Amino acid sequence: MLKNIVFDLGNVLVNFDSNELIYSFFNERQEEVKSFYFDSLWNEYDQGLYSVEEMIEKGVKQFPELELCIKKLMYHWTEFVIPLKDNVAYIKDLKRFGYKVYILSNIPEDDTKYLRSCGVFDNIDGGVFSYEYKKIKPDPEIFNILLEKYNLK
């Protein structure tokens, strides 16, 4: 019988739209900035390989004329991560029915702090986040970490 349910965060328990994020902070060169950050760097940020300051440094090196916008992007991007309240509330129902609920997500540390403050993790039994283990999905190792950490089958 099914006892454990594992959720992702992005577009499951929270909404995050990188287009909206980029277009909110940049009036010019949006596609270049989006490509620069979200084609590869963001995965490394999710893995915990770069701090916010290092992400700013990399962006400013690539786009020096956009320094202020890059700083705003990196200091305020979590404001664009919106909890999906109905989905988060559904976890309470699952808990009432006796399920254990876990999260497995590619996410940087600052985002987990923000989501904790929003109550997204209030009814979660545990989670594995990419920044903690320097691994991201779809690497099978991060799935194995979750299974072993919580003795899931």
Language-model regions, residue ranges each:
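Active-site neighborhood of HAD-like aspartate-dependent phosphohydrolases
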Residues: 1-39, 47, 57
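Glycine-rich phosphate-binding loop signature in dinucleotide/nucleotide-binding domains
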Residues: 1, 96-99, 150-153
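Short, solvent-exposed loop/turn segments at secondary-structure junctions
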Residues: 12-13, 18-20, 107-110, 133-134
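Conserved Lys-Pro-Asp/Glu-containing loop-to-beta segment of HAD-superfamily phosphomonoesterases
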Residues: 4, 136-153
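Short, acidic loop-to-helix structural element flanking the phosphoryl-transfer center
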Residues: 53, 71-102, 140
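A metal-dependent, Asp-based hydrolase signature
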Residues: 43-73
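Substrate-recognition/cap helix-loop segment adjacent to the acidic, metal-dependent catalytic center
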Residues: 86-132
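Alpha-helical elements of Rossmann-like donor-binding domains used by nucleotide-donor carbohydrate transfer enzymes
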Residues: 20-24, 40, 54, 58, ...
